[in-house]
Amino acid sequence: MDKKMKRTRIADALHGGLVGQEINIKGWVRTKRGNKAVNFIALNDGSTIHNMQIVADLASFDAAQMSQITTGACIGVIGTLVESQGAGQSVEVQASAIEIYGTADPATYPLQKKGHTLEFLREIAHLRPRTNTFGVIYRIRHHMAIAIHTFFHNKGYYYFHAPLITASDCEGAGQMFQVTTLNPDSLPRTEEGQVDYRKDFFGRHTSLTVSGQLEGEMAAMALGGIYTFGPTFRAENSNTPRHLAEFWMIEPEVAFLEIEDNMDLAEEFIKYCVQWALDNCMDDISFLSEHFDKELIDRLKFVLEKPFVRLAYTEGIRILEEAVKNGVKFEFPIYWGADLASEHERYLVEVHFKTPVIMTDYPKEIKSFYMKLNDDGKTVRGMDVLFPKIGEIIGGSEREADYDKLVARANEMGVPEKDIWWYLDSRRYGTAPHSGFGLGFERLLLFVTGMSNIRDVIPFPRTPNNAEF
Amino acid sequence: MDKKMKRTRIADALHGGLVGQEINIKGWVRTKRGNKAVNFIALNDGSTIHNMQIVADLASFDAAQMSQITTGACIGVIGTLVESQGAGQSVEVQASAIEIYGTADPATYPLQKKGHTLEFLREIAHLRPRTNTFGVIYRIRHHMAIAIHTFFHNKGYYYFHAPLITASDCEGAGQMFQVTTLNPDSLPRTEEGQVDYRKDFFGRHTSLTVSGQLEGEMAAMALGGIYTFGPTFRAENSNTPRHLAEFWMIEPEVAFLEIEDNMDLAEEFIKYCVQWALDNCMDDISFLSEHFDKELIDRLKFVLEKPFVRLAYTEGIRILEEAVKNGVKFEFPIYWGADLASEHERYLVEVHFKTPVIMTDYPKEIKSFYMKLNDDGKTVRGMDVLFPKIGEIIGGSEREADYDKLVARANEMGVPEKDIWWYLDSRRYGTAPHSGFGLGFERLLLFVTGMSNIRDVIPFPRTPNNAEF
């Protein structure tokens, strides 16, 4: 086989412009079927959900070689791209030469033709990219990342890397993982008997970040608009289909945006991502719609159709109380001051308004210290974007720009000033109105793929008792 | 001041198309000078290195307000964009209204007009984005990230997220940070008295990854081509201008690429990034050239000019031995089997070839277990891209695709098979020739910015005894 012949990606070959030409296709065997005269091999190379049909005339190929071509094997094929006579594909490759790169013993290869449960595939996360489902999901994941970078780049916002290892634990977003190089069998101790973190790698106690927001704000107060896109961590012992210990987050932070501008940005942003998916991933989305979630495409179009409803928390509570009065049953009680549960959010979105909702002006007690206090002294300019099926997809706020108010709120919430001296500096010197929000990347992917378990939209999920691979 | 008037970014206003129009500019004061009749304010909003000159006729503004406009203050200005009479700028804004968002007390604001050392600025990493130098660096950092995504996206390679928290420590790339939720004051113990990591969050001992390569290969063996772009960690106690404990790495991994293809990819990739910088960041690069590194632009063009020299390690050693014979002095000894030091790499690039060098076919003893063994049984298909000033900028290899050879090499290098069962599966089932490499993002930035300390090209550097902010 001619090693120097350029490889053609199956996605490109399927477009049909190369019909009549000799091409070189490489990929993994999905299925092989046929009769005594001819074999049909469905080959996939990851460039598309669609396989290329390889037609091998058995008169031209060694039977021993052909018998090695089983599901999961990797082969290279040279042949002529022709219009297909069969149903199910428009073009196929009439093979003139086949090279086997790697076999896959049918007796042990875990991914045979038959369907597998998602649970089983999680146990072989190193092989699941070879399935149709996960090829689809990882391609969509890629496209959503590119959409995000493109959106912000076009706005003139800069991609900014917040640190992962942090000595700060004031964000209040959740439990943290400790990062250390101390030997647990010979921990250094202070005179008082405490672990002496001055001897640790960073000379202090350090953890994995739960958010890059505070550092991102420092950059926004100089560069104008920035966004982070990086991993964040939560050490909560939450074994649910919605929680990961390690996940990716996008956090734009923009100077001179007030809460209304922030809502505009969030709505434009998420619609841009969904539109990108429909424009660029339709083959993959159709596969998921067919196999997992018949309503997926309708749900994606649903969020594009109308402006999101903008709703103050207080009004939202009134609607939910009204619903309860009219006989709607919720698991969790609803009252002014309560943190909304997913059931409440979904009621507002799916039943009451039938459109995504941006809820604002939450009671200050249930939100973080850095959110801008409203004139009523009771509510803050937080905003959550609520979506069908998944509830909260974005959380953000206008930030408190006033130094004195910020210090007062930090004190109220028990955040020590000495831990946020640098954050306070941004309000001490040249403060400006600014806003931002966070989007959990995997939450977005749950929405765009229609998958129901977050472990299926990240390549190697980290959850309690699970860090394999 | 009209709150609803749309803000114009200074980068856009400076293009001049808006001359004669009333615009709204917001940003931070770099300097203010003037006389009794008029003040000139240099305003920067992060959209460009260039400031907008604001002209304030003192007859129209309150003296008390004007006195608050000092270096570091944040203001909004409405005024008419006019062609400038003064030298140094083509347009300026004749202010009709000024709003002060935040003052910056000259008695305490750390960034006064005078120059600051880079060492001092590292201590106020939360404020250094407000300097010209770091505005420039973070904009270039953004552009290089966008260049990287664009390059791979255009090739049809997928952005793939390898896990950060890992139970695997077989890559051999360096010391690792432990990740734990165990309470050091009440560590669970096994019957044998060891720390019982089964009680830790993930049910086992976990660390921060040193590379996403092995997981990336799993994806390449299904999706064809992927790249990672994420943080990686090294716990080495290296307090040098070239080392970080937390840094970002780009690791493409591509099926069906052999070593020559891999060299082509690396060369095309890095030239693409450098060309992008010259095309999109010239104002910022010119600033760095003027203030830090007069040879910067020449060095950037240098790598674009010629094909990189491709040189086998054995031949490289011969050249270096010849140089020693001719009187060249190196600090470290040179002999076949030695790991090259930066001085050797730079000699080859800067003195001998006067072009970047891709060195290949290293002795297997000094490279990782996963590199493809050559037929000589002594060398492996590793490749390092060597650059002027910084030495190695990329390290990669063709990967060992043969199951038996890979197992043998793992055993030789002391990598336990039980720890890489999943990695070996990729060679057990449908293996394929494939290659990849790693580029340290901050190494690229050192090259593109000409900065000499790696702590100055990442927003919040993490190094021994340093995790502030």
UniProtKB/Swiss-Prot annotation, chains A, B:
Judged by the first EC level, this protein's enzyme class is: ligase
Q: Where in the cell is it found?
A: Cytoplasm
Q: Which GO terms describe its biological process?
A: asparaginyl-tRNA aminoacylation
The source organism is Porphyromonas gingivalis (strain ATCC 33277 / DSM 20709 / CIP 103683 / JCM 12257 / NCTC 11834 / 2561)
User: What is the protein named?
Assistant: Asparagine--tRNA ligase
Name any one Pfam family assigned in the record: tRNA-synt_2
Which keywords describe this protein according to UniProt? Aminoacyl-tRNA synthetase, ATP-binding, Cytoplasm, Ligase, Nucleotide-binding, Protein biosynthesis
What does the record give under GO molecular function?
Answer: asparagine-tRNA ligase activity; ATP binding; nucleic acid binding
- GO terms for CC? cytoplasm
Family of the protein in this entry:
Belongs to the class-II aminoacyl-tRNA synthetase family.
Q: How does it assemble?
A: Homodimer.
EC number(s) on record? 6.1.1.22
Reactions that this protein is recorded to catalyse: tRNA(Asn) + L-asparagine + ATP = L-asparaginyl-tRNA(Asn) + AMP + diphosphate + H(+)
Tell me which InterPro entries the record gives: Aa-tRNA-synt_II (IPR004364), aa-tRNA-synth_II (IPR006195), aa-tRNA-synth_II/BPL/LPL (IPR045864), Asn-tRNA-ligase (IPR004522), Asp/Asn-tRNA-synth_IIb (IPR002312), NA-bd_OB-fold (IPR012340), NA-bd_OB_tRNA (IPR004365)
